[in-house]
Amino acid sequence: FFDIQNWHSVQLSLNILHSSIYSQKNKIGFNVGVGARFNNYRISPDIMLKKDGELVMPYAIEGGKRSNFCVTSLHIPMEVLVGNPDRISFAVGGYLDLVADSRSVVKYEERKKREHLKGLPTNFLQAGVTARLKFGDFSIFATYQPTQIFKTGCGPNMQSWTIGLGLF
């Protein structure tokens, strides 16, 4: 029932604190950061997520223009990089997200009406792996999160993956 429209979904990660250790001689380094991550999963516009006790259920709606499931987290990425970070480098690592908020938002055709549901039963800890190809201050990355987004038995089995562009 959770029909995610992948190419309309958006993820934004902002690392507020960042630290790096790098060996010029061995061309290897380690990066760690702390920041915020915002995931906005676009779902079918004729569905709204609602809680039935602790269970997340889809409900059919009419007149929906856009329906989203949003997760806001404290984001802690860690990567080991090989190569020259000022030119070309490759990094692999992982991340840990501590979920602060989750909600469902529906925007209807008549623009002014919105419906919100906060506090969906998501797992507090979410973790994943990252691979990144960096060209100076620009990078192409992919992430996969094998941990479930919803608590066991409270929603659909759902992992996320992301392909994106990074700056700095």
Residue ranges of each PLM-predicted region?
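Predominantly the C-terminal beta-signal and adjacent terminal strand-loop region
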Residues: 115-168
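Detector for outer-membrane/organellar transmembrane beta-barrel domains
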Residues: 62-101
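Short loop/turn motifs that connect adjacent beta-strands in outer-membrane beta-barrel proteins
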Residues: 21-29, 84-87
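Extracellular/periplasm-exposed beta-strand and loop segments of Gram-negative cell-envelope proteins
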Residues: 1-7, 41-71, 99-110, 114-130
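Transmembrane beta-strands of outer-membrane beta-barrel proteins
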Residues: 28-34, 74-76, 88-94, 129-131, ...
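Surface-exposed strand-loop-strand hairpins of Gram-negative outer-membrane beta-barrel proteins
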Residues: 1-15, 150-152
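Transmembrane beta-strands of outer-membrane beta-barrel pores
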Residues: 20, 34-42, 96-102, 137-139, ...
